[in-house]
């Protein structure tokens, strides 16, 4: 089996999908997992990007379906800006589309600043912009888990196949969650689900950005990765791509394996 086929299998990618069926299956997964755990609902940070918009709407549909069946469940959408967010209008548009049961805002800027100031005071070193960006991602997850713990909710993650294959997420930041309803989807497949759900085009056609760097605000994922999502999706869906794309993706996949595993122990062999 080729590495490409192995990656497709490992990440549960289908070359083609039925958007309606995928929506139904993923909503059912959220419902079943929630019932199994006995939690009271879900919480997710909403950025205004494609992934959190899709995961948020699926979570809301799951909560509503559980209530229609006589159960109790709620979805809390959380805005987690670092000060003023340049694309705040998109975040508000996403919330309007998702229609969450509750919407809260938790500005992480003061918490991040307190940490970076203390880091410099105690180490004598200024935290790099890259590592500060990871602190932002982890602070957002701290906030979501605090809300989840306080309210009895499960934290939803937005990782999907195009992020998983590149390792393009912060370990124990946006990579930390209780359940992942977008697993196996390529970026373009996620767009198809949002289109099926009736989301505004602006939310799934905008260029994806993690927006974690102060020095490069709104830098796109594709700029940071050096690979387009079209190429990533083509690879994951088993289509022909250039040798340069194959080499770049497979190199990233192998080098970021630690992000897709639980912490290594002497009894594991995936890292050897």
From Swiss-Prot:
Keywords: ATP-binding, Ligase, Magnesium, Metal-binding, NAD, Nucleotide-binding. One of its GO terms (molecular function) is metal ion binding. Transmembrane segments: none annotated. It comes from Bacillus velezensis (strain DSM 23117 / BGSC 10A6 / LMG 26770 / FZB42). It catalyses: deamido-NAD(+) + NH4(+) + ATP = AMP + diphosphate + NAD(+) + H(+). Mg(2+) binds at residues 51, 163. Signal peptide: none annotated. This is NH(3)-dependent NAD(+) synthetase. The lineage of its organism: Bacteria, Bacillati, Bacillota, Bacilli, Bacillales. Deamido-NAD(+) binds at residues 138, 171, 178, 258-259. HAMAP family: NadE_ammonia_dep. InterPro entries: NAD/GMP_synthase (IPR022310), NAD_synthase (IPR003694), NH(3)-dep_NAD(+)_synth (IPR022926), Rossmann-like_a/b/a_fold (IPR014729). It is an enzyme of class 6 (ligase). Catalyzes the ATP-dependent amidation of deamido-NAD to form NAD. Uses ammonia as a nitrogen source. Its EC number is 6.3.1.5. GO terms for biological process: NAD biosynthetic process. NCBIfam families: nadE, PRK00768.1.
């Amino acid at each position: 089996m080729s590495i490409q086929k192995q990656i497709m299998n490992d990440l549960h990618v289908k070359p083609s999908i039925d958007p309606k069926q995928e929506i139904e299956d993923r909503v059912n997964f959220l419902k079943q997992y929630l019932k199994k755990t006995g939690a009271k609902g879900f919480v997710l940070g909403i950025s205004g990007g494609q992934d959190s918009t899709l995961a948020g709407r699926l979570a809301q549909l799951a909560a509503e379906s559980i209530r229609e069946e006589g159960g109790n469940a709620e979805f809390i959408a959380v805005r987690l800006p670092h000060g003023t967010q340049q694309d705040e209008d998109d975040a508000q548009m996403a919330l309007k589309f998702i229609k969450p049961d509750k919407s809260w805002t938790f500005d992480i800027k003061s918490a991040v600043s307190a940490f970076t100031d203390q880091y410099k005071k105690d180490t004598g070193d200024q935290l790099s912009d890259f590592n500060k960006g990871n602190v932002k991602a982890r602070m957002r997850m701290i906030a979501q888990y605090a809300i989840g713990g306080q309210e009895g909710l499960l934290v939803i993650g937005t990782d999907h196949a195009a992020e998983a294959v590149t390792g393009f997420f912060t370990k124990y930041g946006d990579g930390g969650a209780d359940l992942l309803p977008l697993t196996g989807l390529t970026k373009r497949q996620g767009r198809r689900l949002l289109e099926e759900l009736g989301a505004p085009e602006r939310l799934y056609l905008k260029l994806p950005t993690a927006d974690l760097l102060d020095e490069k605000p709104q830098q796109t994922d594709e700029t940071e990765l050096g690979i387009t999502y079209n190429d990533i999706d083509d690879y994951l869906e088993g289509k022909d791509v250039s040798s340069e794309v194959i080499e770049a993706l497979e190199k990233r996949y192998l080098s970021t394996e630690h992000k897709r595993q639980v912490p290594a122990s002497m009894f594991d062999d995936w890292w050897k």
